[in-house]
Amino acid sequence: MDKKLSMALVLLVFFSMLNITADFALATDSVTIRAPAVSKTSSGYIGAVLYITVSAVPGDGHIYVDTWPLTELDTQASARLAVEVAGRMTGKDVTKYDFYYVVRSESPVIGGPSAGGVMTVATIAALEGWKINNDVMMTGMINPDGTIGPVGGIIEKLDASAKLGIKKFLVPWGQTVITTQETIREENRGIIQIITKPKKVNVVDYAKKNYGIEVIELEDVNDALFYFTGKKFSEKEIKGEIQVNTDFLSEEANKSLQKNIEYHDSIEKELKSAKMGIYEKKYMERYLDTAQDFIDKAKEDMKTGEYYTSLSELFNAEIYIGVVDEYLNADDLDKRLKDLEEKINSVDSELKEKREEIKGIVSLEFLSAAEKRLKDAYDYLDQARNYVNNYDSLNAVYAIAYADKRCDTVKLWLNLSLKYSQGEKISIDDLKEDAWKRIEEAKLVYVYVSSMVGESSVSDAARSLNDALSEYEAGRYTSALFYAIESNIESSITIELSMSGDDPGVIGEKIQRARDDAKIAIQLSREEGYEPMLAECYYEYGENFEEKEDAANAFRMYKYAKEVALAYKHISNPETMPTVVTETPSVSTPLPSTPSSQGTTTSKEGSKFILILGSGLVGLFMGILIGSTFRGK
């Protein structure tokens, strides 16, 4: 009986392990794709080819990168960003997969993110089980928003790719005409000179003439997917003209306008009668003049219904008036700081108390705005203390004025949050989880971009990321989420604008795309049944900056509008999956063997290998187990 029981247990273990092994094998998808690179030799730079195998298996969100010859850290950063973008595009939860990237090359290549786009394509193909068309190769880094960023060494990469018999070569948008360095040998009166001169090259003509290859510009990963797989994700189109309306702020804007006019007149009279030096008085008058300019701008913007922009301008006006007010009346700065701290703490307590009453997405967005402004008020209070301790009275009164007026705006957004509180209550656990995911994403993008442009260029992103972490620790999860969004945006615009150079055409196209993306995000929110009021505020502000030809801030505000509109989308509709459109079949040529890639397999071969290996291990285990069972008897 004992032998029969033991044998039954052995068989149960055997079939269970075999089933697990088979399930794992069937769930394994691997894709091998080729990416052009640049290698440095004694005679200069030449093209090289990377063979990248990507596997996606059920797991816990780990990402493993195996490279040979060794490459730089940006390859790891590119892999992580590829997973992030792939998850967003496919709608799959990438934390439920482990990803393996095996990168091989016949020669050492120069570090760089130019394979990021290819890695993203391969990652999506692995997740979806799609085949790759090997008649196509591509160069281009991956941006956090899924667009393809510019790279160098395009001619060298094209030369290397041509040797593989490809038919199409994909390049980032705006890089079909590039500047290369041409080395010229000149002789003048017996003296030979080697001169390097810049030379413009039309990549389309060069590829057609020398190799018969078609060069195609890409805007984003979705475009690349079409050429590599014959499939792409359906993209939302703007349905008619998207109307942005901030009328819900009209009452607050009118109140603020009247308040600022009266405040300005009052402090102006007080300044005129104040006893101080002529230069000191003129210096204060300039603050009031600047405030008046903001008031005048706000009046004009209110005429066209731009109420959020008007409120922003009136906030600035009130700060400048407040500086003069504090300068004239704050005789005891230490006491003023104590009073201001009590005011901010009181508003903080009210916010904590009212937070429990918040219901619905719109109310939650306004709560985010209130919490973020509260953090701002505390930060400027700390700055004011430092200035007072260092006897810097002028900067101290500016920081005091800012913290005081910012505290007032916390009340404004909190009241709006309560006014529009309706619907279901949002789970704190969901908010906490969402905030942490956003922070992790912001960390990833920051590391990626800083590896490209240096940490000093993304200091604003680092500051916002630190703010996100501190707000998360304080339990203000909506504020933490928005600071994480801010960090992500700051990193993204840094890399995108820095790679655009001074080309107004490229920058204009990026702003247009950002504007359209924001419109689509607003449209999606409306289709899901709620009005993304805060996103509309940022969109309006972006239009205002665009009218002023402030490209960087317009770009920034449109990106804010998009991200804010989608910030809580998964809470209201977590199961939304993208639609796949097949437009043309993908015709694939056989892929040559990968250099030094023994053990790298395709999807089916990998599954068979894992199944055979797993079965063998199970058999070995069974033999030991059976033997020990009967020897024990």
Question: What is each stretch, according to the model?
Answer:
Residues 4-15, 612-616:
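Sec-dependent N-terminal signal peptides
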Residues 3, 22, 607-609:
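Short, basic-rich loop-to-helix N-cap that marks the start of a DNA-contacting helix
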